[in-house]
Swiss-Prot record:
It comes from the Eukaryota. One of its GO terms (cellular component) is plasma membrane. The keyword Metal-binding applies. Mg(2+) binds at D716, D720. It comes from Tetronarce californica. Belongs to the cation transport ATPase (P-type) (TC 3.A.3) family. Type IIC subfamily. Keywords: ATP-binding, Cell membrane, Ion transport, Magnesium, Membrane, Metal-binding, Nucleotide-binding, Phosphoprotein, Potassium, Potassium transport, Sodium, Sodium transport, Sodium/potassium transport, Translocase, Transmembrane, Transmembrane helix, Transport. This is Sodium/potassium-transporting ATPase subunit alpha. One of its GO terms (biological process) is potassium ion import across plasma membrane. InterPro entries: ATPase_P-typ_cation-transptr_C (IPR006068), ATPase_P-typ_cation-transptr_N (IPR004014), ATPase_P-typ_cyto_dom_N (IPR023299), ATPase_P-typ_P_site (IPR018303), ATPase_P-typ_TM_dom_sf (IPR023298), ATPase_P-typ_transduc_dom_A_sf (IPR008250), Cation_transp_ATPase_P-type (IPR050510), HAD-like_sf (IPR036412). Residues 1-5 form a propeptide.
Amino acid sequence: MGKGAASEKYQPAATSENAKNSKKSKSKTTDLDELKKEVSLDDHKLNLDELHQKYGTDLTQGLTPARAKEILARDGPNALTPPPTTPEWIKFCRQLFGGFSILLWTGAILCFLAYGIQVATVDNPANDNLYLGVVLSTVVIITGCFSYYQEAKSSKIMDSFKNMVPQQALVIRDGEKSSINAEQVVVGDLVEVKGGDRIPADLRIISACSCKVDNSSLTGESEPQSRSPEYSSENPLETKNIAFFSTNCVEGTARGIVINIGDHTVMGRIATLASGLEVGQTPIAAEIEHFIHIITGVAVFLGVSFFILSLILGYTWLEAVIFLIGIIVANVPEGLLATVTVCLTLTAKRMARKNCLVKNLEAVETLGSTSTICSDKTGTLTQNRMTVAHMWFDNQIHEADTTENQSGISFDKTSLSWNALSRIAALCNRAVFQAGQDSVPILKRSVAGDASESALLKCIELCCGSVSQMRDRNPKIVEIPFNSTNKYQLSIHENDKADSRYLLVMKGAPERILDRCSTILLNGEDKPLNEEMKEAFQNAYLELGGLGERVLGFCHLKLSTSKFPEGYPFDVEEPNFPITDLCFVGLMSMIDPPRAAVPDAVGKCRSAGIKVIMVTGDHPITAKAIAKGVGIISEGNETVEDIAARLNIPVNQVNPRDAKACVVHGTDLKDLSHENLDDILHYHTEIVFARTSPQQKLIIVEGCQRQGAIVAVTGDGVNDSPALKKADIGVAMGIAGSDVSKQAADMILLDDNFASIVTGVEEGRLIFDNLKKSIAYTLTSNIPEITPFLVFIIANVPLPLGTVTILCIDLGTDMVPAISLAYERAESDIMKRQPRNPKTDKLVNERLISMAYGQIGMIQALGGFFSYFVILAENGFLPIDLIGIREKWDELWTQDLEDSYGQQWTYEQRKIVEYTCHTSFFVSIVIVQWADLIICKTRRNSIFQQGMKNKILIFGLFEETALAAFLSYTPGTDIALRMYPLKPSWWFCAFPYSLIIFLYDEARRFILRRNPGGWVEQETYY
């Protein structure tokens, strides 16, 4: 082979200039579609000569420095391209001018406009509109800052990918090893890695020694995978001769050729995909947009109607414009933006106490709308620790205890065969407990060693006592470690029993172990391994394998003292001791068991109408076993394979629609069209996707979204980040999750437990219900705030309610009660109903507007006007004489206006009475809002069923009353807010109306419960 002068024909797999140029011309969409496809590599199929031909690399000397420099200049550095980021000021502006804020800004601008018109046309303009504009602007700015602060902690996806990129790499150039910056690594470089290194690029392994890599961040498989030059699988993600960029080498050494760098590596593709995906609008954002349309529609309709009416009534153009602006602004619920934000924040805090950390406030409600959950298996549905589940000895399967607190089944530990089996499992085992953990429960202890050996170690420690003492009594003499060729691990120990000097113990793949045995241990005695026993072994092996468990076989041999005296020189290179004709002792099988709370959580999801789909990189048999264990595939539901086995017919003769459950293999998924995938998602209620790749997880999420589902996705690996980002709500794991997955997600489960998602769904549904109640409560007071202005225009009476007083209601008395509804407990079991349909079940619908504006609001307005007319009548102005009095009433120079009894009133005296009316109207609204708050507690139940257990709400009732009294009676508020003290009797004017509201709504809900689905429900149930 020529020395490193790379062949001119060489075109790297995915980094050629052609690819670069064509990429520029393609649209972003095409690029993302390309990234969603499976990784296509053929380097794992090439032999060493073909690799040399393709990359022009001398397989011993590496590239020449000059050639490496050329390739670096052509392909660029080995780094991930950061995506275009949104500047912080734009994010801030989105919070400040997006969604509900735009309505308040419009109101503020209209207020300033109205004030400007008044300044230009009137000598002494009132400052009300100026105050209102300033207050509205302040509310939006404060709420915007609050929301920005809440979400500023989010979405730095690429930063966490950067942490995964190794800093240094050991390359061989011109036959010399040198450590260079990983960014300088080029395609065709010869790279060496050892245990503890991070892989600097995608490598095709050309030589290896006991090399194992941890691919969990990429594939989700927790077991270290061995790496060697052999081509072992068609799938490049599963073959043994490719090591992937940013995964870790955990033991051994390897040498490989760089086949892809930077963005073109498998990890780079995932990073680009995750950061490039467009994220849709959250359901609550869509609801708020819909709400704004409704409120704006109502405001503009009323404004324009009364603008035309005021022109007909003879007002000037400028007056009509002021009225138009006033009506539109009066329709804006100033306090609602703050209320919604605070309600979502309170729920987010409540969820954090239940181990759900919400990064994005809107995600709180999205989780409640979820109709499909695509859940990862390892660590989410399962405990993420391999545990011994079954043993087979004495021709019998024994069940081990897999519970987290060891409260499960026990088996006979006195058997001589168990004694022998446990001794082999303890001695033929390299796993050890890490130091200083004596006080930690055995199952929680950290172990140095792979997952299977850790499971065996913990099992034996629990059942038989100290493993280290057992090892001390039987010191290891020699060992043959496990390798992929012979598939067993063997060690020879000094024997503490008197029957022989040395004991040979072996474990490995069951069929390989059985082949090396001629006898079997039954009830402590060696018996010949006949066909009957082989069949019994085969049945046990198939049964345990069918449960999705990883099965290991164990055997031993007592080496006779005559042949193997003390000090015998055992040789593991050329074995000078028997490795056949051994005695088979038994099987032990391991599984990552389901978490205790998961089956119940899956059951809750099912009764809540939520479809739970398992998406895992694990083997289909294991995935199906866990799915059955946790109830994702419920008892009695069969897959096509189950039906075929039951009817004893080929699988292809079974109609897929007959099977409710379905296990889809990743390789089959690769060949499915969108339509076929949609069919699977539509016709099967219980689905498991096994052996899936990151791209496929994303395709599954998109498929569910095409069905109209609101999709939640759980994941912990880097491989999950595109799906987490694309889902309506991405849920990452707080303990086992990679930084990348946490950054891509909207919510983090602090305890990695699927059951916490169900708690989150419950909270999300509750906050949607409670937001409805909060909005209904807040909007109702809009009518008694708008109608005084309308009567002022139509009937030409003194203004019954001032702008400043409206602000005191919206941003004062109504705030705490509206927020208190966020603490209201659920009316019924909200986890027994179907997920809401975002198209039909809106946060604010016509029925809510009809109830708030057309019914309860009107009764409230009557209460306000009653107190207004009572005060004016007590001061001498009867209602009939008020019509048409406005112009004279507001004239500064009219100092002798006569009332109904002929008394004369100066301008200042009139205004004191008017402002007292404002205060009384304000107090009346507070009193009728008591009843409104109580009826908003429940949408269907009677208030007597629901009870008054919400302490915050009771505090809200007292708080709004105390605030109203404070504003009315505190000296100085007459000057600052134009609020005047009221006679005690005037407080009672609105009481009858408050009672009417309460009785009216109790009667409505009674009819609603008596006639479900009837006319009253169709017209009034919001």
